[in-house]
């Protein structure tokens, strides 16, 4: 049984540098070593993907000394301040991001140390772009097992740096490397508590997880290489997403039209539109932020929810679905009801 869980309004952080499509293509052109006529189809293919995804700008961190943990701590500190919670009030801190600059210690320990949170439980959850929603499952487990744990913080700091390659020399390279050109950097954090928060929050009413592990090799970010994604094959697996969302809705006792806000992972605008159409969701319920931030990995759905909240469009009693499809191939989701203070 799911323990009582309330998700705070999130806080997010972006690098100061926005990079548009023309700048990204200029970087690829600079690295290109082929003939001029060989460049034309490569550029056309990249622009086609950008148009299909509705990629326009992504924010890329230029400070090479900023660690993912420090980046996450920026969003975490803002989240604590916004919700009037002291770092010393935290009982559990989970880092759910992909980016990390060390195998040990846990990046969560760095975030906690930078915040001055102690003593507490800290751990990392790694589940590709599904990490932050999967972290909710972990928090639910801790809440169920440990009565003394009352307040958790979940965070991520996604920085790509040299994990994205601009060394694209052929159409074959485009096929596996172009997804990396849509990636942006962002940090995000939110609180999970047993009791309602003074500033309001989302009461979690259900969660799901499914991994189709036979597809594990389609998308990888190796420890000693750059991000590669067989995007055509990966997006084809999107047919498995609507059934998982329906399973979540059935658990919550909702219909697709009952949901006021779908805050999904944002690999492309077209993929989100396709899922929402298949579900029969209200058109205005979809949140689209890929054009604003790019694909920011684990933090994408958080930026989408934050964007909708800052628009003042979330009201008491609104039903919300959070979801991410990720490398693995993993599909995770959570259903929540927004409750004002």
Residue ranges and their predicted role:
Residues 56-74, 123-130, 179-181, 222-243, ...:
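Active-site pocket-shaping loop/turn-to-helix segments
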Residues 46-49, 102-116, 156-169, 216-217, ...:
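Acidic-glycine-rich active-site phosphate/pyrophosphate-binding loop
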Residues 75-91, 243-260, 279, 308, ...:
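Phosphate/pyrophosphate-binding loops at sites that engage ATP/ADP/AMP, CoA/4′-phosphopantetheine
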Residues 1-65, 166-236, 325, 337-341:
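Condensing-enzyme catalytic core mediating Claisen C-C bond formation in acyl metabolism
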Residues 73, 99-101, 110-113, 117-118, ...:
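Claisen-condensing/thiolase-fold acyl-transfer catalytic domains that form or cleave C-C bonds
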């Amino acid at each position: 049984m799911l323990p009582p869980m309330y998700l705070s309004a999130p806080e997010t952080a972006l690098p100061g540098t926005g990079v548009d499509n023309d700048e990204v293509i200029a970087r690829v052109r600079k690295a290109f070593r082929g003939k001029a006529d060989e460049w034309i189809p490569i550029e056309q293919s990249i622009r086609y993907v950008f148009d299909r995804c509705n990629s326009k700008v992504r924010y890329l961190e230029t400070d090479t000394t900023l660690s993912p943990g420090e980046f996450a701590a920026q969003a975490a500190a803002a989240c604590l301040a916004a919700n009037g919670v002291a770092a010393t009030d935290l009982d559990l801190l989970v880092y759910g991001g992909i980016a990390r600059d060390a195998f040990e210690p846990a990046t969560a320990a760095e975030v906690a140390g930078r915040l001055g949170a102690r003593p507490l439980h800290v751990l990392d959850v790694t589940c590709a772009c599904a990490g932050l929603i999967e972290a909710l499952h972990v928090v639910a487990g801790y809440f169920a097992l440990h009565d003394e744990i009352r307040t958790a913080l979940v965070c991520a700091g996604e920085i790509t740096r040299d994990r994205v390659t601009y060394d694209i020399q052929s159409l074959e390279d485009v096929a596996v490397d172009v997804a990396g050109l849509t990636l942006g950097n962002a940090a995000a954090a939110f609180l999970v508590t047993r009791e309602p928060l003074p500033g309001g929050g989302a009461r979690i009413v259900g969660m799901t997880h499914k991994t189709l592990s036979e597809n594990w090799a389609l998308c990888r970010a190796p420890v000693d290489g750059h991000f590669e994604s067989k995007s055509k094959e990966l997006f084809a697996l999107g047919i498995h997403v609507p059934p998982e969302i329906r399973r979540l809705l059935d658990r919550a006792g909702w219909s697709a039209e009952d949901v006021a806000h779908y805050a999904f992972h944002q690999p492309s605008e077209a993929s989100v539109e396709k899922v929402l159409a298949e579900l029969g969701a209200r058109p205005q319920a979809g949140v689209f932020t890929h054009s604003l931030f790019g694909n920011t990995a684990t933090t994408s759905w958080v930026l989408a929810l934050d964007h909708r909240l800052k628009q003042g469009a979330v009201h008491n009693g609104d039903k919300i679905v959070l979801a991410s499809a990720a490398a693995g191939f993993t599909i995770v989701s959570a259903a929540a009801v927004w409750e004002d203070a």
